Structure formats: structure tokens, C-alpha cells
Swiss-Prot record:
GO terms for biological process: 3-phenylpropionate catabolic process; L-leucine biosynthetic process. One of its GO terms (molecular function) is 4-hydroxy-2-oxovalerate aldolase activity. The record marks R14 as: Transition state stabilizer. This is 4-hydroxy-2-oxovalerate aldolase. Interacts with MhpF. Gene3D superfamilies: 1.10.8.60, Aldolase class I. Substrate binds at R14, D15, S168, H197, Y288.
């Protein structure tokens, strides 16, 4: 660690959207953002779970627009930067400009781990706006460390000043994480930061985040009570407690985070965010974590097991953006019964 302070990036108000089908009220956003700001996290990501303009038939309609959510958070935050997420092909540079005007100052431009080349326009425009611009390589378990490093190098070339290893499926272990960070560090400029976005489907969210920091990672994503897709993200309050015991600098108020997790976030969950039969299947099969709620809906509709659908999606190597295939897979399974 060398005494450097970790950059704590909260994702409760973006990844956490998946856990409640994108239904945060504006008051929920204000309360959670204020609590996070009071606890001194560095950034607070706000958007539909699938990023700017994710509200749709394919991904699920949000209770509010991205801009309403961003403005609500920006109104109450004094210390943290407001971040947002953009997936090229869902959000556009026009949406990014609107988010910036609403108060977002950090953007994470997210692509599948082998498709960094679709991010060039969005990364370049974010830099022109003066935003803290991050490349976000989703489903990082689906390619080799060496190939991931090549994709990271592309994003760096477009102008991203931080590149994330993103374990969208919660499918990686600590060795997988170490291998990927070592590969990235070998090719990126020394001044380019790296980040880790974990999911907890194998209960390794905190352990993987710690392994990332040990490999030189600068920024860590986490969420209150792990509020996120699948079994959730690395639980923020647990990560802070664990690294505090290691003597690492994080700048956050542990007890304030513990209170916010239990008092503000956990009561909102209509389905517990935890490792259980279905979310463990996500991590084991290496499936995009936000498929969980869609699979459970399809399983109920067609009289199937959600686990069977998830395992089949994993076999077919489905990735984020292919939510429409969940029903196709469910119908195939039903017809083959």
C-alpha cells in the first residue's frame, strides 16, 4: 500500500438499482447520497443500473430518469464527486453532456471486456467535458489477462485515466484478479490508475478487492450492504472494516457506513441481496449478475428453475446486453423438458 489513500467509489445508487428493479425514489437517493457523503466516500455513482438511458423494455424501466436521480444526489453532496455509468450503444455523448450539466463529474465508460474499441468516442468526449474519465471492462473473466490488458491499453489511448477490472459475473477468485492486474500494470502508463469492481456471488467480493489493492489497484467499487446485481457488490462497510484492520488509508467513517447500510439500504430490498442458490449459480456459471431478476421472472412465467436458466446462459456465454435472450433460453428449456 505504501501509505497511499484508497479511492472509495460507492455504487449503491447505480449497481444497487438492479437489486430493486431500478425503483429508488428521489428521497431514497437524497438520503443515501447524503449518508455516503457524510461518511466521506470519494465518489457516488448514480444512474439506472444499466447506465445512462438504460431505462427501457429490455433492461427495465426506472422510477425516475437518470437526470432526476443525478440532480437529487448532487443537491445534497458537499464532498464526494457524483459519478455515472455509460454503456456505448445504450447511452450517447448527448446523454453524457446532460449528465454533466446535472452534476456528474466522473464517468465510467463500460464495454464488454473484448469490445473496448466502441468506447473511443465517448471517452474522448468525456475528456473534452473535463470529466474524470474511467474505462470499465465488464465481464473481465471472459478473456485472458493478456487480452484484457490490450483492451485496457486501447481505452488508455482514447484518453481514459483509470481502467477497471470488472467482475460482472462475480466469477473470479483472488488468483484471477492478481493475474489481470499484473497484466494491466505491465502495459499501462505508470500514471494511469486502475480500479476493481467486484461482485459477491462466490462470497469473494471483499477478498478480491483486497487482492487488487495488493497488486497496486487505486480505486475500489463497493456498495452499502452490498446493494447490487446478483449477490451484490463488495459490501462497502465490510471492505472498510477489513482494510482498516490492515492499516490501509481509506478516509471513510466505518460506523456511519454501517448505520447507512442497515438503516437506509437493507430495508429497501424486496429480494435479499445475498449468496443463495440463484446468485451462487451466477458466479459459478459466470453469468452477468444483472440477469438475476430477469431470470427469476422468466422461471416463474414458464414453470422452470432459475438456476437451470442461469446455467444454460453460462454455457452459451451470454453477456451484458443480451437480456432478451433469457426468454429464448427459457422457452428452449421448456420445450426440451
Amino acid at each position: 500500500m505504501n501509505g497511499k489513500k484508497l479511492y472509495i467509489s460507492d455504487v449503491t445508487l447505480r449497481d444497487g438499482m438492479h437489486a430493486i428493479r431500478h425503483q429508488y425514489s428521489l428521497e431514497n437517493v437524497r438520503q443515501i447520497a447524503k449518508a455516503l457523503d457524510d461518511a466521506r466516500v470519494d465518489s457516488i455513482e448514480v444512474a439506472h443500473g444499466d447506465g445512462l438511458q438504460g431505462s427501457s423494455f429490455n433492461y427495465g424501466f426506472g422510477a425516475h430518469s437518470d437526470l432526476e436521480w443525478i440532480e437529487a444526489a448532487a443537491d445534497v453532496v458537499k464532498h464526494a464527486k457524483i459519478a455515472t455509468l455509460l454503456l456505448p450503444g445504450i447511452g450517447t455523448i448527448h446523454d453524457l453532456k446532460n449528465a454533466w450539466q446535472a452534476g456528474a463529474r466522473v464517468v465510467r465508460v463500460a464495454t464488454h471486456c473484448t469490445e473496448a474499441d466502441v468506447s473511443a468516442q465517448h471517452i474522448q468526449y468525456a475528456r473534452e467535458l473535463g470529466m474524470d474519465t474511467v474505462g470499465f471492462l465488464m465481464m473481465s473473466h471472459m478473456t485472458t489477462p493478456e487480452n484484457l490488458a490490450k483492451q485496457a491499453k486501447l481505452m488508455e489511448g482514447y484518453g481514459a485515466t483509470c481502467i477497471y477490472v470488472v467482475d460482472s459475473g462475480g466469477a473470479m477468485n483472488m488468483s484471477d484478479i492478481r493475474d489481470r492486474f499484473r497484466a494491466l500494470k505491465a502495459v499501462l502508463k505508470p500514471e494511469t490508475q486502475t480500479g476493481m469492481h467486484a461482485h459477491h456471488n462466490l462470497s469473494l467480493g471483499v477478498a478480491n478487492s483486497i487482492a487488487a489493492v495488493e497488486e497496486g489497484c487505486d480505486r475500489i467499487d463497493a456498495s452499502l450492504a452490498g446493494m447490487g446485481a446478483g449477490a451484490g457488490n463488495a459490501p462497502l462497510e465490510v471492505f472498510i472494516a477489513a482494510v482498516d484492520k490492515l492499516g490501509w488509508q481509506h478516509g471513510a467513517d466505518l460506523y456511519a457506513l454501517m448505520d447507512a447500510a442497515d438503516d437506509l439500504v437493507r430495508p429497501l430490498q424486496d429480494r435479499p441481496v445475498r449468496v443463495d442458490r440463484e446468485t451462487l449459480a451466477l458466479g459459478y456459471a459466470g453469468v452477468y449478475s444483472s440477469f438475476l431478476r430477469h431470470c427469476e421472472t422468466a422461471a416463474a412465467r414458464y414453470g422452470l428453475s432459475a438456476v437451470d436458466i442461469l446455467v444454460e446462459l453460462g454455457k452459451r456465454r451470454m453477456v451484458g446486453g443480451q437480456e432478451d435472450m433469457i426468454v429464448d433460453v427459457a422457452l428452449d428449456l421448456r420445450n426440451n423438458k
